[in-house]
Design a protein with these regions (language model features):
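ATP-binding N-lobe of GHMP and related small-molecule kinases
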Residues: 1-86, 90-107, 112-122, 126-129, ...
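Glycine-rich active-site loop/lid that clamps phosphate-bearing ligands
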Residues: 145
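Acidic/histidine-rich catalytic neighborhood
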Residues: 148
C-alpha cells in the first residue's frame, strides 16, 4: 500500500517528502500540462519524484492543481517488480483528486493517465496492467484485463 497525506500549500511550491527514500525532493512549482508532442518531458531529479510530477502535470489540464505539502509512505518494495511505480502514481492521482474536490474521470481513464505519466515523465514505456490492478482491484477477486483491442 502506498499513501500520500498532505494539504494545500501556503506557498506557490509543492513540497514532497518520502518516508521510504532518503533522496530529497527539492520544492517545485506545480508542473504545467505537458506539450502535445510525443516524447519524454524533461523533469528534475530525484527519479522517484518524476512519477509524482507526471501525474500532477497530466491532472493540471485546466491549470487548477494547487501547490501542496505532502508526505508519501509505502510498504511496496522498490525496484522489486511489484508495481511500486504504479502504486505511487495511483496514490498521487487520488491525492490530487481530493485536492481538486473530485475529478470526473472513469477508473479506466485514471489508469491510462497514470500510465502516460510513467511514459512521459519517467521515460518507462510500461504496459497498463499495474495501473489497472492498482485502481480496479477488489480484495478476494481476480481481474480480467483484455488488452487485445
Amino acid at each position: 500500500m502506498t499513501v500520500i497525506v498532505g494539504r494545500r500549500a501556503k506557498s506557490s511550491e509543492c513540497r514532497l517528502v518520502s518516508c521510504n527514500i532518503s533522496e530529497a525532493c527539492p520544492p517545485f512549482p506545480v508542473p504545467p500540462y505537458p506539450p502535445s508532442e510525443p516524447g519524454v518531458v524533461p523533469c528534475e531529479p530525484p527519479t522517484w519524484a518524476k512519477y509524482v510530477k507526471g501525474v500532477i502535470a497530466l491532472m493540471n489540464k485546466n491549470g487548477d492543481v494547487p501547490a501542496f505539502d505532502a508526505v508519501i509512505a509505502s510498504c511496496v518494495p522498490l525496484g522489486g517488480g511489484v508495481s511500486s511505480s504504479a502504486a505511487l502514481e495511483v496514490a498521487t492521482l487520488f491525492f490530487v483528486d481530493q485536492l481538486l474536490g473530485g475529478v470526473s474521470l472513469s477508473r479506466q481513464e485514471k489508469a491510462l493517465l497514470c500510465q502516460q505519466a510513467e511514459h512521459r515523465y519517467a521515460g518507462n514505456k510500461c504496459g497498463i496492467m499495474d495501473q489497472f490492478i492498482s485502481i480496479m482491484a477488489k480484495e478476494g477477486h481476480a481481474l480480467l484485463i483484455d488488452c487485445s483491442q
